[in-house]
């Protein structure tokens, strides 16, 4: 099985990159499944129903979220109605939406789980215990289990990767918007990377207008964050899972921008 994952899509620049490059990436890598983190897709924070469908039309089989899940209030009107949108599973019981979904293609089924970290982020239920619960649930249906762990702290992401090694097919980190170079296969066969990176403005600061962010650091005054304009970037990974052993065998980073050209 091959999985293509695209890191945090930020605003319309990120959506434009998805629209342009995801079809090309699917042609090049021929993934069985494509997953996109869409929690920043609407003006940098949250997701609308229109944008959800646009990401699906651009090639996503499932869309994961994070700490900005609820920033666009209209999500309450559609999150329970769309099939392949997952928000962090460790929100409290009774929260709208779901934290796991299953996607099928060519006789294969992939469980997609979304979890959110608790270090330097608003406190939620324990992601480690929730991982135990959902991995056990998913394993009854499929050996292919993908986790998007939306978290701030590198240590927390590493901890979950090691904790689920051999039980999850892949644990990929999102949220910090900067791609890390630690992609690896853990000893028991789980593909891991601390952060996939972001898809959106290249010359901003984590996708936001850099002058605004610099002003915030210099003055410590509240500012209105806006999505940066100009050059763009796309970050992702391609993960290969052996269909015999059900263990990951490869995780390759993807980075497309003016400094890292895409070759079809």
From Swiss-Prot:
Q: What happens when the gene is disrupted?
A: Deletion of the gene affects the levels of over 800 mRNAs. Deletion mutant overexpresses flagellin and other genes of the sigma-D-dependent motility regulon. In contrast, the two major operons for biofilm formation are not expressed and the mutant is unable to form biofilms. All cells are short and motile. Deletion also results in a significant decrease in intercellular molecular exchange. Mutant displays aberrant developmental patterns and forms smaller colonies.
Q: What does the record give as cofactor? A: Fe(2+); Fe(3+)
Coiled-coil segments:
none
GO CC, one annotated term:
cytoplasm
Q: Where in the cell is it found?
A: Cytoplasm
Q: Answer yes or no on keyword Hydrolase.
A: yes
Catalytic residues (UniProt): 68
This protein's source sits in the domain of life called Bacteria
S-S bonds: none
NCBIfam families the record matches: TIGR00282 family metallophosphoesterase
Assembly information from the UniProt record: Homodimer.
Q: What is the purpose of this protein? A: Plays a central, regulatory role in the late adaptive responses and affects the levels of many genes. May act via regulation of cAMP levels. Decreases the expression of motility genes and induces genes involved in biofilm formation, by controlling the expression of SlrR. Required for formation of intercellular nanotubes that bridge neighboring cells to allow molecular exchange. Plays a key role in directing the early stages of colony development. In vitro, has a metal-dependent phosphodiesterase activity against 2',3'-cAMP and 2',3'-cGMP.
Question: What is the recorded name of this protein?
Answer: 2',3'-cyclic-nucleotide 2'-phosphodiesterase
The organism is: Bacillus subtilis (strain 168)
């Amino acid at each position: 099985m091959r999985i293509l994952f695209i890191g945090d899509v930020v605003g319309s620049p990120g959506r434009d990159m998805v629209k342009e490059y995801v079809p090309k990436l699917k042609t090049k890598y021929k993934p069985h499944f494509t997953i996109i983190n869409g929690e920043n897709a609407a003006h940098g924070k949250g997701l609308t129903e229109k944008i959800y469908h646009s990401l699906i039309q651009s090639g996503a089989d499932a869309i994961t979220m994070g700490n900005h899940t609820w920033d666009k209030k209209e999500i309450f009107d559609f999150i329970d109605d769309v099939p392949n949108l997952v928000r962090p599973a460790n929100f409290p019981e009774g929260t709208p939406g779901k934290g796991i979904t299953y996607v099928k293609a060519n006789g294969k089924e992939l469980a997609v789980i979304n979890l959110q970290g608790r270090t330097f982020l608003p406190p939620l239920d324990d992601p480690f215990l929730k991982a135990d619960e959902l991995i056990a649930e998913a394993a009854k249906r499929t050996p292919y289990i993908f986790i998007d762990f939306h978290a701030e702290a590198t240590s927390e992401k590493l901890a979950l990767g090691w904790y689920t090694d051999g039980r999850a097919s892949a644990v990929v980190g999102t949220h910090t918007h900067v791609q890390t170079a630690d992609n690896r296969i853990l000893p028991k066969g789980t593909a891991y990377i601390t952060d996939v990176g972001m898809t959106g403005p290249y010359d901003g600061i984590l996708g936001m207008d850099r002058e605004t962010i610099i002003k915030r650091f210099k003055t410590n005054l509240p500012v209105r964050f806006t999505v940066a304009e100009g050059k763009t970037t796309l970050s992702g990974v391609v993960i290969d899972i052996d269909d015999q052993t059900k263990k990951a065998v490869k995780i390759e980073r993807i980075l497309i921008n003016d400094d890292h050209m895409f070759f079809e």
